[in-house]
Amino acid sequence: MKKGIVLHKSSLNYGDDIQSLAAYKLVGRPDYILDRENLHLSDVNENIQLLCNGWYMENPQNWPPAENIYPFFISLHVTHNNNTIDFFFSKKLIDYYKRFEPIGCRDYHTVRLFRKIGIKAYYSGCLTLTLENKFNEKDRTDEILFVDAFNKNLPVELRTKYFNQLVPPTIRDKIKFINHSHSNPNMSIEERFKNAELLIERYSKAHLVVTSRIHCALPCVALGTPVLFLDVGFNTKKSRNRFEGVTNYFNTLNNNYFPYSGIDPVGLIFRRTELYKYYFKGKEIKYNWESPPQNPVNIGGLRKELKSKVSNFLNS
């Protein structure tokens, strides 16, 4: 049987591409790379074993995959956006899921959603935790990468103003800013994977990565690069659900450093009326920038288990 992986072919988020790249590396050279949002329209005439991981989905009306696709569900997250929950967990799909259970989920909330309709499900972690650092420690730079670090909690016009209040002057010349998104929905698969590889290489060599992006943080954990995750501004229920079983892998900062960041009435009023500009007093982040703490969880066992499950599926 042919082998395949999924890719969101019009995504503007490199995190999606990194998740697909992790799957690509596990499969080897897949015969097919199928569009995550159009798995129901398989134009392939042969049967495919599909490694089915990632975030689902923008177009839930296009679910489930075509009959010739035999999915291995692992590292799955089901969003509350776009009425996806209604489509994914309708009674008519129970028999479909029964064929392919247990379902591996990257967060505990998704586990509960499947179990609620009687489908066997387990916490698998994310496939990006299988990425490996091909460089040596001597290749590490002194770069401190800020990857979309303040996107969720500081308005654009305030990021520069308050950045200098948050980080000490001794490290500012080591900081580089990286954007984890792009503006080209028509980017080729080759270019997507090339850019994802370049990001992984840079994360592999970094001294520290500060981010608010899950799929920057998790790859860095896999690569052995210290992560400081800004768990700030993610106050909606769907955001918190997405984090269950994820944020324990790295060190985090919370709202203590970023008042008025949430969706509470006071925070909303202060931002919308721009009172934020006058009442936000950034305080220097207390953190060991020169010798950042290692990530708190040893993922060796989980990485081995993920690889084993994928290998068993591909060889079945």
What are these regions (language model features)?
Residues 1-316:
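Active-site anion-handling motifs in enzyme catalytic cores
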